[in-house]
């Protein structure tokens, strides 16, 4: 059986936790930040868990 390939784009975006969840960063934090408040930018800097409906597809993209 051949080796499974990891989707490198997904590997850069998601990090697996110990309880088989995945962490991700918020969107809207890359550019156009002058119009956003400091509170909004601070909230967007935090990492959050991926929703349950997306975990199955991410596990297929990241087999290891």
From Swiss-Prot:
Keywords: Chloroplast, Plastid, Ribonucleoprotein, Ribosomal protein
An annotated GO cellular component: chloroplast
Matching Pfam families: Ribosomal_L35p
Subcellular location(s) per record: Plastid, Chloroplast
Lipid biosynthesis recorded as keyword: no
GO MF terms, alphabetically ordered: structural constituent of ribosome
GO biological process, one term: translation
Domain of life of the native organism: Eukaryota
Family: Belongs to the bacterial ribosomal protein bL35 family.
Protein name: Large ribosomal subunit protein bL35c
Annotated organism of origin: Phaeodactylum tricornutum (strain CCAP 1055/1)
């Amino acid at each position: 059986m051949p080796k499974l390939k990891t989707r490198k784009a997904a590997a850069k975006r998601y990090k697996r936790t110990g309880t088989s969840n995945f962490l991700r960063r918020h969107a809207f934090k890359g550019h156009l930040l002058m119009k956003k408040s400091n509170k909004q930018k601070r909230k967007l800097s935090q990492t959050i868990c991926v929703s349950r409906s997306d975990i199955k597809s991410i596990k297929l993209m990241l087999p290891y």
